[in-house]
Structure formats: C-alpha cells, structure tokens
Swiss-Prot record:
GO terms for cellular component: cytosolic large ribosomal subunit. Belongs to the eukaryotic ribosomal protein eL30 family. This is Large ribosomal subunit protein eL30. SUPFAM superfamilies: L30e-like. It comes from Caldivirga maquilingensis (strain ATCC 700844 / DSM 13496 / JCM 10307 / IC-167). InterPro entries: Ribosomal_eL30 (IPR000231), Ribosomal_eL30-like (IPR039109), Ribosomal_eL30-like_sf (IPR029064), Ribosomal_eL8/eL30/eS12/Gad45 (IPR004038). The keyword Ribosomal protein applies. It comes from the Archaea. Keywords: Ribonucleoprotein, Ribosomal protein. The keyword Transmembrane helix does not apply. The lineage of its organism: Archaea, Thermoproteota, Thermoprotei, Thermoproteales, Thermoproteaceae. Pfam families: Ribosomal_L7Ae (PF01248). HAMAP family: Ribosomal_eL30.
C-alpha cells in the first residue's frame, strides 16, 4: 500500500499536476490528465461532473480518504483542494493507483 500523501508531494516536486475543479476538468478534456484524485467531501454535483468527463476521456478517478483540507495539506498548501489532476507523475509511483480502487 502506498502512502498517497507522500506520493502527492513527490508529484508536486518532480512531476506536474493541476489543482482545482476547473483546471482539472480542463486537463481531462485536453487529454493531459493521467489520474484524477478527489477529496472525500467533494459536493455531489462536482463529483458527477468530474466523473463524467473522466469516464469520457478514460481517465481513472480515485477518492482521497480525507477532506479537501487534508488533500490541500498533503500538497503542502494552506487551503482546500477538492480535485487534483496528475499530468506527469514524475518520480512518484502514484500511477500504481490507476489499477486499484478508492484511495
């Protein structure tokens, strides 16, 4: 089992990601996103939108076990982050989640 918080920090340092609902949806629609991670407390309407676009683009979506505050903290930010799209995993092994279930 990988430590998702640690892997997110590795992606932030060595790869590329986008944070936020609009930017993540844009990355999904442009075909840039390889993996989408959503906080557990994302509102249902946003969750449905992200999941719909991800399904159309065949991008795996995972639910982070924590809240948006905790997801923001995992990325060393002092604000909420509801959705993160992984563009380039860098040196992390976060893409191993693409074959699993919820995080």
């Amino acid at each position: 089992m990988i430590d998702i918080s640690r892997e997110l920090q590795v992606v932030a340092n060595t790869g590329r990601l986008t944070m936020g609902v609009r930017q993540s949806i844009k990355a999904i629609l442009n075909g840039d996103a390889k993996l989408v991670i959503m906080a557990a407390n994302v509102p249902p309407s946003i969750r449905q939108d992200v999941e719909r676009y991800a399904k159309l683009s065949q991008v795996p979506v995972f639910t982070y076990a924590g809240t948006s505050w905790e997801l923001g903290g995992a990325l060393r930010r002092s604000h909420k982050i509801a959705v993160v799209a992984i563009i380039d995993p860098g040196e992390s092994s976060i893409m191993s989640l693409a074959g699993g279930a919820n995080v």
